[in-house]
Amino acid sequence: SDATYRLILERGQEDWDSEYGRFPRLFRDAESIPGLTWPTLTFESEMSVFLGRREVKLIRLGAGHTAGDIVAWVPDAEAMFSGDLVEYRSACYCGDAHLREWPFTLDAIRDFDPKALVPGRGDALAGRATVREAIAMTRDFVNTLYGTAELAVARGRSLKETYAAVREAMDPKFASFAIYEHCLPFNVSRAYDEASGIDHPVIWTAERDREMWGKLQG
C-alpha cells in the first residue's frame, strides 16, 4: 500500500539496522544484501490483480499491525490472506501497531466472512467457525494488551509497572503462544506510548532498544 511505502521511506533503514542488531544470526552474509527492497507498484485503498481468470483483490482495510497493512481477498474462493492483522495461536507483534484502530480493522475482516484464511503466523484456517475464532483470538490479544496498558498509564504507572500488569493479565491466556516472550517487551512499550498519547509509533533503533530494556530492568 501507499502507507507501507511511506513507512519504508520513514523508517525502513532504521528497521533493518534494528533487526540486524537483535538477530544477526538471521542475516547470513549481511554484506551481500544490496539494501532495502523497494516496491515498484503501490495503491491507496484497493487494487485487483488477475491470475488467469481469478481475481485477487488487494485491500487496505485499516491500520493494525502497522499503518500500511493490506489483505488479499480471493472472491471466488472466499479466501483471505490476512498477513499479521490476524494470527492463530501466536502472539501479535505490536511494536509498530495502531492498537486502538486494530479491532475496527478486524471487524472489517470479519465482515467478509471468509471460509478460509491464511494468518500471518499459525496454521492455515479452513471453515468459517475457525476463521472467526482466529479473529476473536487476535482481538482479545490486542484488547487485553492495550486495555491493561491504558489503565496502568491512567494510574500513573511506569513502563516497568505497566509491563508487570500486562503480564499478569495476558500470561494466563497467551503465554503458550508462539513468540509471546519475544514480542511482549515491544508490545508493552508500544501500548504504553499509545496510551500516553503517542499516536504514531516511534521508530525502533538500537538506542531505543537499550532505553526500553533499561526501563524494564531498572
What are these regions (language model features)?
Residues A3-R60, D76, L106, D113:
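Metallo-beta-lactamase
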Residues A3-T4, D84-L85, R121-D123:
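Active-site metal-binding loops of divalent metal-dependent hydrolases
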Residues L41, M80-F81, V118:
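Hydrophobic/aromatic beta-strand patches that form the interior of the parallel beta-sheet core
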Residues T42, M47-R54, I59-G68, V202-G218:
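Charge-patterned, long linear interaction tracts outside catalytic cores
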Residues E55-F112:
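Active-site-proximal loop/helix segments of hydrolase catalytic cores
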Residues S90-C94, L151-A154, Y192:
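Short, well-ordered beta-strand elements within core beta-sheets of diverse protein domains
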Residues E101-E161, A165:
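Divalent-metal (often Zn2+) His-rich catalytic cores of metallo-beta-lactamase-fold enzymes
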Residues A154-G218:
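C-terminal regulatory/interaction regions
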